[in-house]
Design a protein with these regions (language model features):
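Ser/Thr/Pro/Gly-rich low-complexity, intrinsically disordered segments
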Residues: 3, 15, 23, 29-30, ...
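Cationic, amphipathic, low-complexity segments that mediate targeting or membrane/lipid association
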Residues: 2-5, 39-42
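N-terminal leader/targeting segments
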Residues: 3-6, 17, 62
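Post-transcriptional modification and biogenesis factors for structured RNAs
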Residues: 11, 15, 33, 40-316
Length: 316
């Protein structure tokens, strides 16, 4: 099994273009160690790794034939505020009031403590009853972010293998630009210990709100207020109208599962055999720019070809 990557690489590099049914172009430049030619159908794979961090605003063709959804007038309507296991009814009420004041309507609670019939909820949510009435409860964070295209997580801690980090201002600009066309989510952790490592893997960006102290820990409703106000303040920012369509969170998860399954098929083992750590590294890598649908399609094709070639080489 250890010789598969070398064998497979030689097979791909020396495969005649006629077998693929596509035209081929030469690899230019003396720095490329590859022999032979690369089919045009394989070039989008290289494009993923050569793209600038904000490449999703570039003017490029869409090989999948899918078009961008039309922009909406109220991007804040597509912002989903998610609270993971909030323990205080007062915090839930305060967050509802923040959302009412900043024009955000969607509140999702993941496995919250009892709150609907608690007097403290109503006291703190003064004038925001419609936000509480429309609030949705789910059991897991996966359910809460399903259907969105971009997820921002908040934390006050640093750690290895965490996802791509940005300032809260930059993350809100990126989120509101995407919200003009797609649903986005801002995730807040528990009052006591925030988001777990397993929950952070569902986030494309991670932000820490700056503070005057070395170990800041804002109150939950205060953190929501700071992020919600930034979203409100930057809501005029938009993606370019010709930006390629983005993959949803659900499509992103399918890509990750397909890649991990393909690597397992060929006997790939990461450093120290820590597949959970490699899962986080892979997600961080794929999250450096919002994943476009065409990129997801290319990665699925690559994984399907790996399965095909592994069968042909009698690896299974």
């Amino acid at each position: 099994m250890g010789r598969l990557p070398k064998t497979l690489g030689k097979y791909l590099l020396n495969k005649p273009a006629e077998e693929t049914g596509t035209s081929a172009v030469p690899v230019h430049g003396p720095k490329y160690p590859c022999r032979g030619k690369i089919a045009r159908s394989q070039q989008p794979f290289l494009e993923i790794f050569l793209r600038a961090p904000l490449s999703y605003v570039q003017n490029m063709n869409n090989p999948t034939g899918r078009t961008q959804p039309s922009p909406i007038d109220r991007p804040l309507d597509q912002v989903r505020i998610i609270l993971v296991e909030p323990a205080s009814p007062g915090n839930i009420g305060s967050v509802a009031r923040v959302l009412k004041n900043t024009g955000i309507r969607q509140l999702v609670l993941v496995n919250p403590a009892p709150w609907r019939n608690e007097p403290e909820t109503g006291w703190m949510a003064h004038g925001s009853a419609e936000i509480l009435e429309a609030a949705r409860e789910v059991d897991t964070l996966e359910q809460a972010v399903s259907g969105t295209h971009f997820v921002v997580g908040t934390t006050h801690r640093r750690g290895r293998f965490r996802v791509v980090e940005e300032s809260h201002e930059a993350a809100c600009v990126e989120a509101i630009g995407i919200a003009h066309r797609y649903p986005v989510a801002i995730v807040f952790g528990r009052e006591k210990d925030g988001l777990s490592r397993e929950e952070l893997v569902h986030c494309h960006r991670l932000v820490r709100i700056p503070s005057a102290v070395d170990h800041p820990s804002f109150n939950l409703s205060q953190a929501v207020l700071l992020m919600a106000f930034e979203l409100f303040r930057t809501q005029g920012y938009q993606l370019r109208p010709d930006a390629p369509p983005l993959a949803s969170v659900d499509e992103f998860e399918r890509v990750v599962e397909h890649i991990l399954g393909s690597l397992t098929r060929i006997g790939f083992r990461p450093f120290n055999d820590d597949m959970s750590g490699f899962d986080r590294v892979l997600r961080r890598f794929l999250s450096r720019a919002p994943l476009e649908r065409r990129d997801a399609w290319v990665l699925h094709r690559i994984c399907s070809q790996i399965a095909k070639f592994s069968k042909r080489l009698s690896i299974e």
